[in-house]
């Protein structure tokens, strides 16, 4: 007998219309997106820690594979071929599968600086990884095998302890008399810190256990645990936990299986509270050991979903009495609005709980007005407990005692939506609360007032990108997503585990055929504010750079750069205060983004606006090497105090500095000859100068680059003078000897070049004085030289003096023929055939300034994948690695681990362990070892 369904009989033929019984059954098969949403909501309902993709402040994007067994990393990078920015290919962290022994990976969490990654699996086991040298080189520092395999240990809440460092921040930008004024302040760190400045991770487990994983100064990890106090056994089974650091300690909110929210305040005491590494070397100090002090604030929060008191006079007992049972908590957060002052004080935190109806939920009867998600908020407040007046009549032996303050939660108005909320994120350094929905739409709110950012309400005040009118266009939805460091990009995972990049957009004042200058200006100011916040917090700003390149015109980019120099208070006039130039924290950042804006590919010459900052960045690099070399060789004892690797670095940069100096002289000689025909006609001279584009001329006229040239000359003299007294042997003698021979063979002596710089100083000074420009007026033309790469009118007399008097007077002290015959193509600044050929056939190590092997075919010429995959960390001798900068696409080869302590210290001092001289992060060529 055949089965009844084999005859194709429809259910409706048996029971009538599909809607006649109002069973609430779906009329069609759920789509893949519906299934994905249902699965995502289930994940969020069951456990609070289910972040499968995370973007670190260093720029590394980590994501869990679709089968939950692997972690992949990727990042933003600039393409060598055309200078366009996009996501890199994935690099798998194969060691993760081994570390977690096949357990399903469920959660990712980066620390505040973005250098350490915590990976949690379904059994609550946690492994930790660090980024030592490159964005795609992630090494394990803590094994998950240390943790027990226990379902009750599953992580429901996780937070890295803050790092003890104060950073520069910016509160807002306000337009004053037609110009934007930025509000900088130094933000002090808040909360508990590891005394040894090591990593510390606080976790809350499903069984109500709080544990702190912390790293000792020797690199080993330890942990302490304590149980959260609960009112009943059912309260011990937690589903979600939220943690935030405040001035009074760590605030913890938990949600239990019996649907209660409890609040705790936790303090961590370290013994000793201070850590001095020098005392540890003497064996007189123990490692810091933490301990918990836990206070249960005894706040249990009942809730009605949605809130029954939204409308005044409404009977709470009659409004949707059944709806609370339909909702499940899907996320729990504690929001701490951003501080706007240097003291670190912040407004009171508030708790955010998102409740959603499952997609498969069956309603008792049609209720179209029931929202899919409800955002419930409680304000955390402190009030004094008051006693009944009768207690005043009771005599007390102890006199009037102080009444302890009481912590209360005041429920605020709910926020409802017909769409499901899939994430709540505090972005833009705490200045924006972003709520993401299942249809890919994102709503932005002010964390202090919960006012929605729907556009520009006040065009004269800018606090964030979202407030200034930036928004995300609707795109195919990703159910797992993470914001970039500046929150102007989103990376998301779709149902198939594929990664997608979403980019913020803005009209920039062009709307409906009209132009609004105020909206354009606010957009530029908000981008400036975001970039400056990244600079102050030492955060990766490649996401901002992508926006600038893709969306801004050249004029708008110039406007942005002018705002950056003003916001960061960069005084471009370094005629007198030259010593401040070497340690200025923001000059490299401003130069780097300016150079990157004009980069159109590795094999194309930069335009003049990009070449000027790119040359100054490299001058700064060379100028910093010599004082660092002198500093680290002081007091070194032994038969060979000079490190061969360091001397090789000094040798390469010495050759580069000399050739760049000769390149400037060669161009000056050519310009002097070219302008000789108009030397007697000032008007013709001025017109010819307007049509002349010369990198060497701008480098000489700018006080910033001229100061770097002077520092280099000082270093070259010190290197040459120190050779006679240096005890050298082996490779050190070979390299140091070659340095001195290179200096001796130069067509121009160092003292002669310093004489040229002094002549330029005099010409520039007289030009400023003749025009009546004092110290307050000079930054203007100096900034025009740097940002616009144009010679301002006030400096035209200086150019005339340099070409007519300074250069001709020094011809006799230089070997003009040797300068003319020099090969400067390897410097990379020219657009002649020789420079073009060198760019396509060779690479130059951007740090060591030494040529790298020729390219073969279309490859990079940087070694095979097999050679890179060896990495050398597996043996103690180190291995040669090729790293490429994700921003400028330049290459550097290095030994890792470094062969000597001095070499490592120099690399660390110069800031080149993880980043290039331009500030871009390294990408390991060939990928990561297995």
From Swiss-Prot:
It is found in: Nucleus. It comes from the Eukaryota. Its main location: nucleus. Belongs to the Mediator complex subunit 16 family. Component of the Mediator complex, a coactivator involved in the regulated transcription of nearly all RNA polymerase II-dependent genes. Mediator functions as a bridge to convey information from gene-specific regulatory proteins to the basal RNA polymerase II transcription machinery. Mediator is recruited to promoters by direct interactions with regulatory proteins and serves as a scaffold for the assembly of a functional preinitiation complex with RNA polymerase II and the general transcription factors. Component of the Mediator complex. PANTHER family: MEDIATOR OF RNA POLYMERASE II TRANSCRIPTION SUBUNIT 16 (PTHR13224:SF6), THYROID HORMONE RECEPTOR-ASSOCIATED PROTEIN-RELATED (PTHR13224). This is Mediator of RNA polymerase II transcription subunit 16. It comes from Emericella nidulans (strain FGSC A4 / ATCC 38163 / CBS 112.46 / NRRL 194 / M139) (Aspergillus nidulans).
């Amino acid at each position: 007998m055949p089965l009844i369904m084999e005859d194709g009989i429809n259910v409706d033929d048996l029971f009538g219309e599909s809607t006649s019984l109002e069973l609430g059954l779906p009329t069609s098969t759920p789509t893949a997106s519906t299934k994905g949403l249902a699965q995502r909501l289930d994940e969020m309902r069951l456990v609070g820690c289910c972040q499968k993709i995370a973007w670190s402040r260093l720029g590394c994007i980590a994501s869990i594979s679709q089968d939950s067994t692997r972690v992949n990393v990727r990042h933003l990078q600039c393409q060598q071929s055309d200078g366009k920015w996009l996501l890199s290919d994935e690099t798998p962290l194969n060691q993760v599968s081994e570390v977690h022994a096949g357990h399903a990976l469920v959660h990712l969490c980066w620390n505040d600086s973005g250098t350490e990654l915590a990976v949690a699996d379904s059994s609550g086991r946690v492994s930790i990884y660090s980024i030592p040298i490159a964005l795609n080189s992630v090494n394990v520092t803590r094994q998950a095998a240390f943790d027990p395999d226990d379902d009750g240990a599953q992580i429901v809440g996780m937070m890295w302890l803050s790092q003890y460092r104060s950073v520069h921040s910016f509160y807002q930008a306000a337009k004053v008399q037609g110009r934007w004024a930025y509000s900088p302040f130094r933000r002090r760190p808040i909360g508990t810190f590891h005394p040894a400045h090591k990593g510390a991770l606080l976790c809350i487990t499903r069984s109500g256990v709080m544990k702190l994983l912390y790293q000792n100064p020797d690199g080993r990890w330890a942990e302490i645990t304590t149980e959260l106090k609960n009112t009943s056994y059912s309260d011990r089974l937690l589903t979600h936990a939220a943690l935030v650091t405040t001035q009074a300690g760590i605030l913890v909110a938990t949600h239990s299986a019996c649907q209660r929210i409890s609040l705790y305040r936790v303090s961590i005491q370290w013994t000793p509270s201070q850590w001095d590494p020098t005392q540890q070397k003497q064996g007189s100090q123990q490692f810091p050991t933490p301990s918990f002090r836990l206070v249960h604030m005894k706040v249990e929060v009942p809730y009605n979903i949605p809130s029954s008191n939204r409308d005044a006079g409404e009977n709470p007992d009659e409004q949707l009495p059944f709806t609370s049972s339909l909702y499940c908590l899907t996320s729990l957060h504690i929001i701490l609005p951003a501080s706007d002052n240097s003291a670190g004080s912040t407004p009171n935190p508030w708790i955010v709980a998102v409740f959603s109806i499952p997609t498969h939920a069956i309603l008792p009867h049609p209720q179209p007005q029931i929202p899919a998600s409800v955002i419930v908020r409680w304000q955390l407040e402190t009030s004094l407990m008051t006693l009944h007046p009768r207690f005043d009549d009771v005599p007390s032996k102890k006199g009037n005692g102080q009444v302890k303050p009481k912590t209360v939660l005041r429920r605020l108005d709910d926020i409802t939506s017909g769409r499901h909320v899939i994430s709540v994120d505090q972005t833009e350094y705490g200045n924006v609360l972003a709520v993401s929905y299942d249809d890919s739409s994102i709503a932005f709110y002010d964390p202090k007032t919960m006012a929605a950012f729907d556009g520009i309400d006040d065009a004269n005040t800018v606090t964030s990108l979202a407030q200034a009118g930036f928004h995300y266009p609707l795109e195919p939805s990703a159910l797992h997503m993470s914001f970039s460091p500046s929150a102007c990009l989103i990376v998301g995972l779709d149902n198939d585990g594929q990664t997608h990049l979403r980019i913020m957009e803005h009209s920039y004042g062009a709307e409906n055929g009209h132009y609004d200058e105020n909206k354009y200006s606010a957009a530029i100011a908000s981008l400036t504010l975001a970039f400056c916040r990244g600079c102050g917090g030492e955060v990766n700003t490649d996401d901002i750079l992508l926006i600038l390149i893709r969306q801004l015109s050249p004029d708008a980019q110039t406007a942005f750069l002018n705002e950056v120099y003003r916001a960061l208070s960069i005084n471009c006039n370094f005629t007198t205060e030259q010593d401040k130039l070497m340690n200025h924290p923001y000059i490299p950042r401003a130069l780097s983004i300016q150079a990157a804006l004009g980069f159109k590919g590795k094999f194309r010459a930069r335009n003049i606006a990009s070449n000027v900052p790119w040359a100054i960045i490299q001058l700064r690099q060379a100028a910093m090497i010599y004082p660092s070399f002198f500093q680290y060789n002081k007091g070194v004892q032994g038969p060979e105090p000079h490190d061969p690797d360091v001397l090789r670095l000094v040798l390469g940069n010495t050759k580069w500095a000399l050739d760049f100096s000769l390149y400037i002289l060669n161009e000056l000689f050519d310009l002097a000859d070219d302008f000789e025909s108009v030397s007697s006609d000032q008007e013709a001279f001025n017109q010819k100068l307007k049509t002349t584009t010369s990198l060497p001329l701008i480098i000489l006229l700018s006080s910033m680059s001229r100061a770097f040239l002077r520092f280099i000359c000082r270093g070259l003299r010190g290197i040459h003078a120190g050779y006679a007294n240096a005890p050298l042997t082996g490779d050190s003698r070979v390299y140091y000897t070659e340095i001195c021979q290179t200096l001796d063979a130069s067509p121009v002596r160092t003292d002669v070049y310093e004489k040229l710089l002094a002549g330029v100083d005099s010409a520039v000074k007289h030009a400023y004085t003749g025009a009546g420009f004092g110290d307050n007026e000079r930054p203007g033309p100096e900034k025009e030289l740097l940002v616009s790469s144009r010679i301002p009118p006030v400096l035209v007399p200086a150019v005339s003096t340099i070409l007519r008097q300074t250069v001709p007077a020094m011809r006799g002290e230089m070997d003009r023929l040797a300068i003319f015959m020099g090969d400067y193509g390897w410097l990379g600044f020219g657009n002649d055939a020789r420079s073009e050929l060198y760019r396509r056939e060779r690479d130059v190590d951007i740090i060591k300034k030494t040529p790298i092997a020729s390219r073969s075919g279309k490859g990079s010429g940087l070694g095979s994948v097999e050679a890179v995959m060896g990495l050398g960390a597996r043996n103690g001798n180190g291995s040669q690695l090729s790293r490429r900068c994700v921003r400028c696409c330049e290459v550097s080869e290095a030994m890792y681990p470094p062969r000597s302590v001095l070499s490592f210290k120099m690399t660390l001092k110069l800031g080149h362990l993880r980043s290039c001289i331009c500030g871009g992060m390294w990408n390991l060529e060939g990928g990561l070892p297995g």
